[in-house]
């Protein structure tokens, strides 16, 4: 564990403008609590975008639409939660026949820097609609996206201890800055872990470790704890490190050739075994030079 000194970290200097879109009936409270925390950063702001769905040819009269608006407002009001983090998301109601288009409009209007979306489990009542919405939004690459996954839909996320897995590279800076913003908002202890594996080429392992060290130095958080964990399986290493933490933050898979695949099978299996909530961060920019898979010692993909 290595304490670090304060230096400049440019990503943390930006003012976050957060949008948390929600659909009626989804597991919204964990997602909203993360949105509030991200918007609590200095100069930050946020919007809870309540999307009232209009289906062509079904109950589209004025009375029916007004009833759906009232139902949505009551549902959103019922999502209030107790927390030391002050509520930062203002509520905007939008009637829409195209969810993705309405979110894109809201992003442009508010100049949003981050979207916060539910990462649905198999128990999520709106999982099919949310998965389809995610597929439509991923190609845009206009904002960073934080995907929030929790096994307790009725409980806001209020972690005392946060673990963030940092690989190294440009995308990892967004993961690290997101973790730092959440830790600052919640007053949480923050641990950054770097998982090393023998499966990839030693030169790449060295570059990633040097990048990780630089990211830690740039974070400007002397209280941040740092760990190096060696494991033959990165997902297994994260699972072991996650014990005792209340929130785990990971980066999404970054594959220019297949940008819609956010997480590999092994990592997804690991996430399903975690007892605590998970935030997966997908940066808006995908590096064209970053391989989608680790490079093994023999020069081939592992």
Where are these regions (language model features)?
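Gly/Ser-rich helix-loop-strand patches that form or flank binding pockets
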Residues: 1, 32-34, 106-155, 239-302
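A short, acidic, amphipathic alpha-helical segment used as a generic capping/interface helix at domain edges
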Residues: 210-214, 230-242
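Conserved active-site histidine-acidic residue motif and adjacent donor-binding/catalytic loop
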Residues: 94-100, 229-235
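Small/aliphatic-rich secondary-structure junction motif
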Residues: 7-74, 80-92, 158-228, 247, ...
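Phosphate- and divalent-cation-binding pockets in alpha/beta enzyme and binding domains
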Residues: 30, 102, 237
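A cross-kingdom feature marking solvent-exposed beta-strand/loop segments within repeated
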Residues: 87-92, 98, 102, 124-129
């Amino acid at each position: 564990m290595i304490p670090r000194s304060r230096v400049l970290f440019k990503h943390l200097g930006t003012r976050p403008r957060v949008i948390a879109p929600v659909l009626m009936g989804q597991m919204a409270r964990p997602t909203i609590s993360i949105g509030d925390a991200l918007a609590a950063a200095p100069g930050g702001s946020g919007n809870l975008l309540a999307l009232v769905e209009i289906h062509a040819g079904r109950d589209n009269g004025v009375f029916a639409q007004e009833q759906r608006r009232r139902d949505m407002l009551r549902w959103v009001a019922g999502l209030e939660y107790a927390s030391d983090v002050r509520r930062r998301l203002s509520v905007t109601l939008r009637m829409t026949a195209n969810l993705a288009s309405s979110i894109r409009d809201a992003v442009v209007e508010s100049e949003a820097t981050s979207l916060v979306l539910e990462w649905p489990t198999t128990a999520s009542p709106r999982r099919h609609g949310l998965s389809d919405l995610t597929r439509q939004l991923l190609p845009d690459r206009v904002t960073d996206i934080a995907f929030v996954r929790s096994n307790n839909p009725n409980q806001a996320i209020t972690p005392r201890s946060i673990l963030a897995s940092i690989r190294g590279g440009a995308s990892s800076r967004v993961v690290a800055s997101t973790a730092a913003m959440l830790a600052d908002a919640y007053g949480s202890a923050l641990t950054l872990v770097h998982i090393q594996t023998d499966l990839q080429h030693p030169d790449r392992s060295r570059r990633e470790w040097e990048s990780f060290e630089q990211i830690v130095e740039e974070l400007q958080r002397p209280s941040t704890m740092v760990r190096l964990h060696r494991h033959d399986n990165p997902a297994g290493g994260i699972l072991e490190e996650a014990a005792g933490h209340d929130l785990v933050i990971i980066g999404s898979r970054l594959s220019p050739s297949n940008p819609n695949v956010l997480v590999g099978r092994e990592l997804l299996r690991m996430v399903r075994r975690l007892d605590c909530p998970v935030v997966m961060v997908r940066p808006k920019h995908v590096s064209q030079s970053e391989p989608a898979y680790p490079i093994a010692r023999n020069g081939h993909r592992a």
